[in-house]
């Protein structure tokens, strides 16, 4: 069986980054859950929903980068497989959010390359720190993402079932990823790390909503 060199891994990482950042480059592996009939939204409602979905798309870009960075540096093969499988499932979220943004005549965040780079670096560092911390980083990330999704679900216009079905399914997946990481040996992160993660998350949500 061929062993991948460091250059091979870097090329693979670059390919993954392009697939995460280039609009339309990511295809979902599962059907889009937004099977509800299209509903008419007021201009202000559509603008707000687009902002929320843009934030959620950026969050999934961050998750992709996190998993890619961790898979590059994780020490145990089973942990690398967990990271790679989670990244595949997160691709569905990317595609679903992008589809909904297109339906709303909107766009993904122009800041996504920045969020990807930051998250990739954090994921790689977590992997270097050790698999238990890497998995703990995943669990904390998914916990924070779930909180954002639950808040966004509450903010959706009552009639917007298409966006709601997407976010509900995404939230179920995020909670599953959190539980999987904890069951695989993830540990609680130090409080300063969790606070820093929350601060970065708030910056991402506030800027990606508009840009």
Language-model features and meaning:
Residues 1-211:
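Non-heme di-metal
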């Amino acid at each position: 069986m061929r062993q991948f060199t460091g250059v091979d891994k870097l090329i693979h990482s670059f390919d993954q980054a392009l697939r995460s950042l280039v609009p339309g480059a990511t295809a979902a592996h599962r059907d889009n859950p937004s099977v509800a009939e299209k509903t008419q939204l007021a201009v202000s409602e559509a603008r707000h929903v687009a902002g929320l979905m843009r934030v959620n798309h950026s969050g999934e870009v961050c998750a992709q980068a996190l998993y890619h960075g961790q898979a590059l540096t994780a020490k145990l093969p089973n942990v690398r497989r967990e990271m790679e499988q989670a990244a595949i499932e997160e691709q569905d979220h990317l595609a679903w959010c992008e589809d909904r943004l297109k339906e709303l005549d909107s766009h993904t965040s122009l800041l996504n390359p920045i969020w990807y780079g930051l998250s990739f670096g954090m994921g790689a560092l977590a992997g270097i720190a050790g698999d238990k911390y890497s998995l703990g980083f995943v669990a904390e990330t998914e916990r924070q993402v779930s909180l954002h999704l639950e808040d966004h679900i509450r903010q959706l216009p009552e009639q917007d079932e298409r966006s709601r079905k997407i976010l509900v399914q995404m939230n179920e997946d995020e909670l599953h990823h959190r539980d999987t990481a904890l069951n695989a040996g993830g540990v609680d992160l130090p409080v300063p790390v969790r606070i820093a993660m929350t601060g970065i998350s708030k910056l991402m949500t506030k800027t990606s909503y508009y840009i």
